[in-house]
């Protein structure tokens, strides 16, 4: 994704392939609480960014993985437990010499998927969230015994993997049923979700929160399971679900992607509309109040100037969205939102007030560039085909991907083609 929210910070990749970060605890150099977007040094061209609780990872266009932030328990995968103030490259040898195509960061662990559809994991593992068969932390990336993986998502203490055939495997902390195995037990190995009717669906993308999990299938249906205490499962009640359960409350629209925050959910439809459910404290739902929502409510499109959205991200208490034109909007907890004050020029001290509705981040704070524009594809398959600069229309980068992954992306693209200048 060109956009990712951590616990209290935000990352975005601009259409110029530059990474910007702001908020608290993102590991910039020097370690500061950046109150408005600031460029992050690192590789020249970045394609994807993933934010965790206090660390983050980025994938460069050459397939290299860089990590930064808190290092305790090894989430950076650099062989020690030390923090890094700058983005630091993980040696390619850590992945068997194969390029990385996507990464996901959890509470204190990281998962990387390579062009060979292999999974590697590092970091905290007290709940088995690394999927390596034990509960020992890993300071370096360790290969997971699960092949053919094309998408992944990290929750706080659990992980979700999607295979090329659309099946889903989960591991880690199982309390509240967030693993989807009809129990509350943990798993130390990625375990197939085999309950019907979910097993018959072909999952395209997944999202994982603190204690709940979401999956979007190829038919545009949303499945939810885990903790439902605030309505974050989009099922109209506060009950937990131990098995994937179909959510059908989005105005009849097909779902394109979903994001999990701390006890809340954001859902993006194929029409570019945004729906929100769950905990509403600090305005994280973008619905002009702080009330919880048990039934998903549509975020007023006027806040986005009626522009269709192409990406959403959810953090602990803040949210972000990108329009098809590359405009960035944020809302929720003020420390992580990246707005300037009302001082002349709009570039003064940051405004730390919470926002109850989506508010546009001035493009000048992102170097005048928009957020990298991706096609409206499932979240983990939103590859940078639409980013024309820096050779991001395919070429050698696509050639390095598994044939099945490319096929699935092209199938998704065939539903809609978006062109931008």
Task: Pin down the residues of each PLM region.
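Eukaryote-biased RCC1-like beta-propeller repeat architecture
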Residues: 1-419
């Amino acid at each position: 994704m060109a956009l990712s929210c951590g616990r209290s910070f935000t990352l975005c990749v601009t259409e110029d392939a530059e990474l910007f970060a702001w908020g608290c605890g993102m590991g910039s150099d020097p370690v500061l609480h950046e109150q408005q977007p600031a460029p992050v040094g690192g590789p020249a061209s970045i394609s994807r960014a993933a934010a965790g609780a206090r660390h983050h990872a980025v994938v460069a266009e050459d397939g290299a993985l860089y990590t930064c932030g808190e290092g305790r328990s090894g989430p950076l995968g650099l062989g020690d437990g030390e923090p890094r103030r700058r983005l630091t490259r993980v040696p390619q040898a850590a992945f068997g010499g194969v390029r990385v195509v996507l990464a996901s960061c959890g509470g204190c662990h990281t998962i990387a998927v390579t062009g060979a559809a292999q999974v590697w994991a590092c970091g905290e593992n007290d709940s088995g969230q690394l999927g390596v068969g034990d509960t020992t932390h890993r300071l370096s990336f360790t290969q997971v015994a699960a092949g053919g993986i094309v998408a992944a998502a990290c929750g706080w203490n659990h992980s979700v993997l999607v295979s090329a055939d659309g099946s889903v495997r989960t591991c880690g902390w199982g309390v509240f049923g967030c693993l989807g195995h009809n129990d509350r037990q943990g798993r130390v190995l990625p375990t197939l979700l085999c309950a019907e009717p979910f097993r018959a669906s072909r999952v395209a993308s997944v999202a994982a929160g603190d204690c709940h999990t979401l999956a979007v299938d190829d038919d545009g249906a949303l499945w939810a399971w885990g903790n439902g205490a605030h309505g974050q499962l989009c099922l109209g009640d506060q009950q937990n679900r131990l098995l994937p359960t179909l959510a059908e409350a989005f105005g009849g629209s097909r779902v394109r992607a979903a994001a999990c925050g701390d006890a809340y959910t954001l859902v993006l439809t194929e029409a570019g509309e945004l729906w929100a459910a769950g905990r509403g404290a600090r305005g994280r739902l973008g619905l002009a109040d702080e009330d919880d929502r048990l039934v998903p409510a549509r975020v007023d499109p006027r806040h986005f100037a009626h522009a269709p959205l192409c990406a959403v991200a959810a953090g602990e208490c803040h949210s972000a969205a990108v329009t098809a034109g590359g405009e960035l909007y944020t809302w929720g907890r003020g420390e992580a939102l990246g707005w300037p004050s009302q001082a002349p020029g709009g570039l003064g001290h940051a405004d730390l007030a919470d926002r109850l509705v989506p508010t546009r981040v001035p493009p000048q704070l992102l170097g005048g560039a928009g957020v990298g524009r991706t096609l409206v594809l499932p979240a983990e398959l939103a590859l940078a085909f639409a980013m024309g600069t820096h050779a991001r229309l395919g070429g050698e980068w696509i050639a390095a991907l598994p044939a099945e992954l490319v096929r699935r992306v092209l199938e998704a693209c065939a539903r809609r083609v978006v062109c931008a200048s």
